Swiss-Prot record:
Keywords: Ribonucleoprotein, Ribosomal protein, RNA-binding, rRNA-binding. The gene is rpl15. GO terms for molecular function: rRNA binding; structural constituent of ribosome. SUPFAM superfamilies: Ribosomal proteins L15p and L18e. The keyword Ribonucleoprotein applies. One of its GO terms (biological process) is translation. This is Large ribosomal subunit protein uL15. Residues 1-38 are annotated as: Disordered. It holds the Pfam family Ribosomal_L27A. It comes from Methanococcus maripaludis (strain C5 / ATCC BAA-1333). It comes from the Archaea. The lineage of its organism: Archaea, Methanobacteriati, Methanobacteriota, Methanomada group, Methanococci. Binds to the 23S rRNA. GO terms for cellular component: cytosolic large ribosomal subunit.
Length: 143
């Protein structure tokens, strides 16, 4: 087992114990403050050299009224919903009529597979959803 003596034991008798002048070991005065203190005053040149992007704002936040946030559902999930609650939907010409807004969705997305022919009504459709609905023998109606 290695027996290592502590630094302070080695430094006994050296008056300042490795801290140079005695007053350099008091507080944070020797290093110009703790942490980022003085970065807009006496340490400004080091900020300019090593961290020039520390201060200032960059980019922007869009106004929330400009961001369109629609409730979405994938076409595969919609078919699962239809199969689960068959009695809640009307059938016209062999196609199930689904109004997505009545079940709380505004946009239909194209993830998943469908085999049921359906007429889907929604505010918006993705291109993939349109293709899959038509491929299954259904149609889409944008409100």
């Amino acid at each position: 087992m290695i027996r290592k003596s502590k630094k302070i034991t080695k430094m006994r008798g050296s008056r300042t114990c490795g801290y140079g002048e005695a007053k350099k070991h008091r507080g944070a005065g020797h290093r110009g403050g703790r942490g980022n203190a003085g970065h807009q005053k006496h340490k400004w040149l080091s900020v300019c050299k090593f961290n020039p992007d520390y201060f200032g704002k960059y980019g922007f936040n869009r106004n929330p009224c400009l961001i369109k946030q629609l409730e979405t559902i994938n076409i595969g999930e919609l078919e699962e919903y239809i199969l689960k609650y068959k009695d809640a939907f009307q059938v016209e010409d062999g196609k199930v009529v689904v109004d997505a807004t009545t079940i709380g969705y505004e946009k239909v997305l194209g993830k998943g597979r469908i085999s049921t022919a359906m007429v889907v009504k929604a505010v918006e459709f993705s291109e993939g959803a349109k293709e899959k609905i038509e491929a299954a023998g259904g149609e889409f109606v944008e409100l």
